[in-house]
Every structure is written in C-alpha cells, then in structure tokens.
Amino acid sequence: MAQSVPPGDIQTQPGTKIVFNAPYDDKHTYHIKVINSSARRIGYGIKTTNMKRLGVDPPCGVLDPKEAVLLAVSCDAFAFGQEDTNNDRITVEWTNTPDGAARQFRREWFQGDGMVRRKNLPIEYNP
C-alpha cells in the first residue's frame, strides 16, 4: 500500500520564495514549476494564506514520477503598505496516491492516515 511509504521529495522552481514587484494596482501572475522527483505517483494540493489576494491555477493535481507541472500564482491588485502581507505564502502539500488509483485527484487522499508532506513558499512583495 502506497500510504505506508512516506512521500518522496518534490522540487519547486523557484525553490525558496515567490517575489512580486510593484506596482500593485493591477493583477500579477508568476509561474512556478513543481516537479515530482520521487519514484511514486503523488497527489498535490496548493493552499494560500490569503485567498482574497492570492490564487493558484491549477490548485491540485496528480504527478507521475519525474513529471512536472507549471502553476500560475496570481496576486490581485491591493493597496500596498495598507494591508498586512507579512504572513503571505503558498503551501504545496503532497502525498502518495493509493496503489491502483486512477490518475484523478481526490481530496480524501489528504484526509486519511497517510503521510502528507508540505513545502512553504513565502511571498515577498517589493515596493
């Protein structure tokens, strides 16, 4: 059963943070790449700390071993300096898919007793 094996590693490009640059009076979109560097199929889901300001497309999916996906991270217009942006980040969560599961993302993979790994990517806003 896949759930008894801890999920392997993923890589993200960029690897440590996402940077948006001013002006913030229009929507910005930044692309990040998520790569499944493990030997098992994984399901991934992306969470944001500020759903009003930040969006991710596609927000979830399935990656085969060594497969990559390009995600569009969007930042809606906002009043820079007047809103708290200190804790903004996106979190990539991933888990092994069950053996024999279809290549269709299922939220319940994250709700059972299988191990879920997380990688945080802080958002930096340059004035």
From Swiss-Prot:
One GO CC term on file: cytoplasm
UniProt keyword Cytoplasm present: yes
Main location: other
Keywords annotated in UniProt: Acetylation, Cell projection, Cytoplasm, Cytoskeleton
Subcellular location: Cell projection, Pseudopodium; Cytoplasm, Cytoskeleton
Residue span, MSP domain: 9-126
Keyword flag Acetylation: yes
Modified residue annotations for N-acetylalanine: 2
Pfam families listed in its UniProt record: Motile_Sperm (PF00635)
Tissue expression pattern: Sperm.
InterPro entries: Ig-like_fold, MSP_dom, Nematode_MSP, PapD-like_sf
Protein role: Central component in molecular interactions underlying sperm crawling. Forms an extensive filament system that extends from sperm villipoda, along the leading edge of the pseudopod.
PANTHER family recorded: MAJOR SPERM PROTEIN, MSP DOMAIN-CONTAINING PROTEIN-RELATED
Note: Around 30 MSP isoforms may exist in C.elegans.
The protein, known as: Major sperm protein 3
Source organism of this protein record: Caenorhabditis elegans
Phylogenetic placement of the source organism: Eukaryota, Metazoa, Ecdysozoa, Nematoda, Chromadorea
